[in-house]
């Protein structure tokens, strides 16, 4: 099928968009770049490559606030907890400017002693799992 424009015949391909129309932000999934917001030595080290998610520990593989992920950071594999993401969530939940994570050890203890970014207040409802994170947090949103 062709389109006639003042005697010229243009192929159908010219009518397609030249830019992506997918959603601007998405949740955290594999290969998502994240920002480490605690004061651990590994998180504060200068990265020539940003930390990336290599696995999300839930059923559907899409991470939200409070989910555990596995990161590739400075050539190492480290576990982390998502404490903020760019994707808009339910009403009255904050949307952050970056995808924030806090590094944790295998037993669930945070690696750092302070969290530099504010945490969403709805993590307080889940305080059993995140009590150690909430204890070292400085601000809540």
From Swiss-Prot:
Q: Name one GO cellular component term.
A: mitochondrion
Domain of life, per the record? Eukaryota
Mind listing the UniProt keywords for this protein, alphabetically? Answer: Mitochondrion, Ribonucleoprotein, Ribosomal protein, Transit peptide
Q: Respond yes or no to whether keyword Methyltransferase is given for this record.
A: no
The annotated transit peptide is positioned at 1-19
The record, for PANTHER family, names:
39S RIBOSOMAL PROTEIN L14, MITOCHONDRIAL (PTHR21037), LARGE RIBOSOMAL SUBUNIT PROTEIN UL14M (PTHR21037:SF3)
Name of the featured protein? Large ribosomal subunit protein uL14m
Q: Which species is listed as the source?
A: Danio rerio (Zebrafish)
Q: Which gene encodes it?
A: mrpl14
